[in-house]
Curated annotation (Swiss-Prot):
Transmembrane segments: none annotated. Required for maturation of 30S ribosomal subunits. It comes from Mycobacterium leprae (strain TN). PANTHER family: RIBOSOME MATURATION FACTOR RIMP. It is found in: Cytoplasm. This is Putative ribosome maturation factor RimP. One of its GO terms (cellular component) is cytosol. The lineage of its organism: Bacteria, Bacillati, Actinomycetota, Actinomycetes, Mycobacteriales. InterPro entries: Ribosome_maturation_RimP, RimP_N, RimP_N_sf. HAMAP family: RimP (MF_01077).
Amino acid sequence: MNTGLPSQIQVIELLGGEVARAGYEVEDVIIHTWSQPFWITVLADGDTVLARDIIATLSHSVSALLDGLDNIVDRYFLEVSSLGMGRPFTSEKHFRRARGRKVELAAVGRIPADRSNWGDVRRHGDVGDPRRPRLCGMRDPAIEIMKAIV
């Protein structure tokens, strides 16, 4: 069935260069075919915060690129956003991008007092408090982090 929409891979390939020129990368593209008009969500992220003015500029660029496709419907909603504060840490780049930001961590068990310290993300590997540890303790075998959210 032809929905009149490009595939997720086509959108990522199409937008990757434009988003990279702005200093960011396309983290994900979600194409919602259940709504009318269709909804396309582009999630971008980078080492600097994706501010509103940058999102607005990217939205215009992304829209122009999508409108230039042959297989795009006449009407669609476009959302350009970032995972922002709810982003899970799933790779080293997420830790790097969170540098200097406050985080919430859930540790398995207790973190010994000699390894706890209040603080924000400093560098990959900091040790911290069970309520808000600094993130270099990840490699410490005595500390197992269950969940980390910026």
